[in-house]
Amino acid sequence: MFSKTILSLIASAMLFTGSVAAAEPVRIIFETDMGNDVDDVLALDMLYKYQDAGKIQLLLISNNKGNAYSAPFIHLMNDFYGWSGIPVASSPAELLPRQKEKQPSYVEAVAASGVFPASSAETFDSVEKYRQVLAAQPDRSVVIVSVGLLSNLKRLLDSAPDRYSELPGRELVARKVRLLTMMGGSFDGQRRREFNIRIDIPAARAVFGRWPTDILVSPWEVGGQIFYRCAALDKIGYAAQHPLKMAYASYLPMPYDRECWDQTAVMAGVE
């Protein structure tokens, strides 16, 4: 039998204060829908900074957005931030929910701009790479930070034993994962149909119903009160061209301040 707790950050704000430094870097897998809202880019920027500081080991970046430019954009970010060795994975577009696309998406605007070198790194299948990475980790050591759809996590739960592990997906997760933090849902009584849940409701039901570890949820109303200011973006001046700045400028007409939904899930998973 598996037991789990599902906790909202609304009821656990103490996680953001007085945290004790971990004895070793937190092992993180980042699950993103890169190409939808632009806050995924800043969330990934945070993870690179945590890795620079030795606070995390970023094991895998897994994408659940069916945009042909999403994975190239993530590879580009890896290269720009000096972490080209971090594996990138994605599910085939036909296995992901169809979504309306903002044309052009910021991932296309940046990746196809020619400003940044294209990467030749391989993009792996998300579930296969999840299984490979998880199987190699110590038991109960991995924190998955999910800031997009739950499609890949459902596929992971449903996965069969393979060359990496004799365990089926749910049992592999139970053995290797310590915590799932996610941005998703809304619990303020406004009956808000939050994007990460409503776009793939069967996956959300499967994850909330069958996930075998504790889940910490940062809902819409938490990140909706925190803003990344345009003034902070303007102060990034250490590179003549920066993919973070270009992504924000491509997403909406500048200047604008943007909510920090995904960043709260990252902070909860690390801190």
Question: Predicted regions: what is each one?
Answer:
Residues 1-9:
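Sec-dependent signal peptide recognition
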Residues 8-17:
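Bacterial N-terminal signal peptides
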Residues 22-271:
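N-terminal acidic, glycine/proline-rich low-complexity segments
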